[in-house]
Amino acid sequence: RDSSTSRGLGDVYKRQGCEYVIRFKVPESSEIKCKDFLKGTVQVSSNTLDDKVLYKSDGNPTYHFANVVDDLDMKISHVIRGEEWLPSLPLHSLIYSAFKQKEPIFIHLPLILKPQGKGKLSKRDGEKFGFPVFPISWKEGDLEIKGFREEGYLPEAVLNFLALLGWNPGNDEEFFLINDLIKSFSLDALNKSSARFDPKKNLWFNQRHIKSIKNSKLEELLIGELERNKTSFDKNKIPNIVSLIKNRLSVTTNIFETTSYFFSDPKDFDFKFLKKFEASEAKTLLSLSASIIANSDFNKTEIIKENLEELAYKRGVSFGKFLGLFRVALIGKLAGADLFETMKLIGKETVLKRLLNLSGLIG
């Protein structure tokens, strides 16, 4: 027990005009038994507990006292917190007993561990490993770390991910919409052991939830990003663009980058891929492709595809490799939305311009 505790000296301090605190008088030499929903019975000797301060010398209550009073006032039925607060349970239990009040159900959840599985996840880990750990951004001095919101994570995705860190649905199901999660969740299925924070799995959940949200939400987001970046656009094309790229989004914050080639010509090109072609052959393929496009009806993409496939065959190039060249010319990279749907959205004139532009850049 804390030797600095001065029991029974309150009146002396008052008469002398000394500053004093009010402590909780822990019973001596007794066994304190508390109940935790996950841990079961927690038993400690009262001799290991200090007489904790309830009121500080300035008259303000401490956390422990205010916590219990607040929960009593609000008629809290369940206290759910991290297991690092388990050592406070005996004191809180004693305070409830002193008030002659029934304790709420205490549930001390296991910790969330670092990605490596060792040690509690901390806010610094986000900065260190490059992923968010807070709901929103936070500042500490000159340091600012982005939260899930700023990094483009949906609230329902983070909730889904976190729920499965500490709860087992009893089957292999992982993806839950909020209403389904509410129906399925049970305190009886909470995990007792700590879980590792997997940022890749968190990203996977976010991608799944982006696929499930209404397109209109992404349309609003994209329009906002286009306006913020002062990019001109045809509002009538936005729904079709969102439908094309929705399944490619892993975070909402990259929607502008993911759709940029629909609104402006690419400035960077995958020259590593282009090196698979002889320069003269690449220029010829691009030129002949432009001729096909110039004489095509853009409402008949199947015919365009057949004509381009025939061109590749005649030039002795696999159609897959040829389409890679075509795609790099249009969007600058190999990965992107459906090529022929993209062509229809950006229009014949833009397709021709981009084909000839890349041809001119090839040495």
Segments (PLM) and residue ranges:
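Single conserved hydrophobic/aromatic residue that forms the stacking wall/gate
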Residues: 1-13
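C-terminal accessory/binding modules appended to enzymatic or scaffolding proteins
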Residues: 219, 277-330, 335
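Conserved hydrophobic residues forming the short capping helix/wall of the S-adenosyl-L-methionine
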Residues: 96, 226, 312
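Catalytic adenosine-cofactor/nucleotide-binding cores of aminoacyl-tRNA synthetases and other
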Residues: 100-269, 275, 331-363
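Histidine-centered active-site/metal-ligand motif
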Residues: 2, 64, 92, 108-109, ...
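Structured secondary-structure scaffolds
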Residues: 11-98, 284, 288, 330
